[in-house]
């Protein structure tokens, strides 16, 4: 059988050689139908007893699938091998196309092609990057993966950075996955430690001391910052701090003043505005204590103007007329002119005034000149009826219809001319400059009121109509003793603060008795040119029911007292003593004064200014920029001022606003309760 089989195969080979080339690539129909049929060959008995051998069975001879199974002795390998075996036969048969050889991986010969078939790892089925080795199996293979790879062919990288059992791969910052592995990295500004997992911040400020130039270098985790003081912004191009112009950003509601490192907002206090709590917007200054500002047109105010007369009347009466004046009078003032009468040629005159609270009469006629002061003190703030009447040989003065003085005289006070007595009468003040003609000089200003006047026995003829038509000539219905600042003007004084006997050189000792009607305003200010080197001011506190007392040196607070209730019926006392070495602020109700940490520098600035000329203002500041001092609103309310032991009299001011009352202040308005 073996010999016949061999001969048969040789015959097939010979037949193949003589077949046309067009048929060499294909099996016959009959042969092809038998390829997948398992037929056991008729081998010799000795050959059948041997174990199957690939070389002997399928290379030296042609084998069918059954014979191939004898080699592998299992179906999986046989099923895997035999189709590929047929491919090798087709590729290496004589005259086969080169394309067939290429399909068999270009093995050099049939033996190489067939021997390679049983090795499942050839060609390599595993991923080249991920496999460590390939293990051949029965019609199968097993890829052994390198660390960091997975999959049946080691084709999938393991992302160690997402391993739930080792969060972030154990990296303190960044975990970077790589094919088959991973590594830790640090963010910019950090350096890797030797354990290759943890990161440490890099201190750029120490490594590069000049990295910020003139700014301050501040190390932060992973980076650094170049810091500038408040009000400055870092400029990386010049490595320096540049001032921020906050005013260019429309920061303030009204006036904004930029300065190196900051800015300040100001509101026009003279128009009734103050800086709000946000230090940017402006709001109206509220009334904190309502005063009784009601007036009566029948009450003539004698000190409506700073200088000059309040009212002028001229009488032309029969020559038998004698001078007479009767009126009700109210004042707290101690000195001033009530009325002045004179003839048309100014040769004869009569003065009725108040000195030290008592009635004083001065007169001059063609025969004599006299002055007399007497009677009771009447500057008590109540209404007193005063009458002055010329008799035949004397002048009679009565208060409340009781004679207090009787002045002898020769002749008439005023000489008739052409059958008429022409007389001019001036209320409160002197016409022209006649002070030098007086027997004894007197303050022409008088803060007082008159009513019910009867002049030359003509009643109120001529005067009533004038008084009724002018509101500023009317008196408040009720007043108290004190000086009144209406919140619309100031008074100026010239005060020398230098004390040659004092080692401190200059001294400002101020005592104020105040009853404000608004909680914001300048009480006292020293002005030098366009600057305000010193100011004592009130500001409404945040509570809305109390006030803060502030001492300003130029534009900064040197000392302040917080949350004091000053808007009440009872006046409050305030003291401020300051020289080049120290500052003391005091009130009887609060002792917890807050002083500036920069006080000594502020005092040095003030000391330099006080060596020059300063003007003293009460009730506000003059018409300078309202950025000259943080508070520029006029003070409103009652206030009496003592500076360096001298009680200031507004009648002695260099100038004062017409509406400032020197010796009277409106009473607090009484709130009527409804029951």
From Swiss-Prot:
GO molecular function list: calcium ion binding; protein-containing complex binding
Sites bearing (3R)-3-hydroxyaspartate, chain numbering: 136
Record domain EGF-like: where: 117-155, 157-200, 201-242, 243-283
Gene Ontology process terms (BP): blood coagulation; fibrinolysis; liver development; negative regulation of coagulation; positive regulation of phagocytosis; positive regulation of phosphatidylinositol 3-kinase/protein kinase B signal transduction; response to axon injury; response to lipopolysaccharide
Disulphide-bonded residues: 58-63, 121-134, 126-143, 145-154, 161-175, 171-184, 186-199, 205-217, 212-226, 228-241, 247-256, 252-265, 267-282, 449-475
Residue span of region Thrombin-sensitive: 88-116
Signal peptide: 1-24
Modified residues (4-carboxyglutamate): 47-48, 55, 57, 60-61, 66-67, 70, 73, 77
Prosequence residues removed at maturation: 25-41
PANTHER family: LAMININ G-LIKE DOMAIN-CONTAINING PROTEIN, VITAMIN K-DEPENDENT PROTEIN S
Name by which UniProt lists this protein: Vitamin K-dependent protein S
Organism: Rattus norvegicus
Name of the gene this protein is made from: Pros1
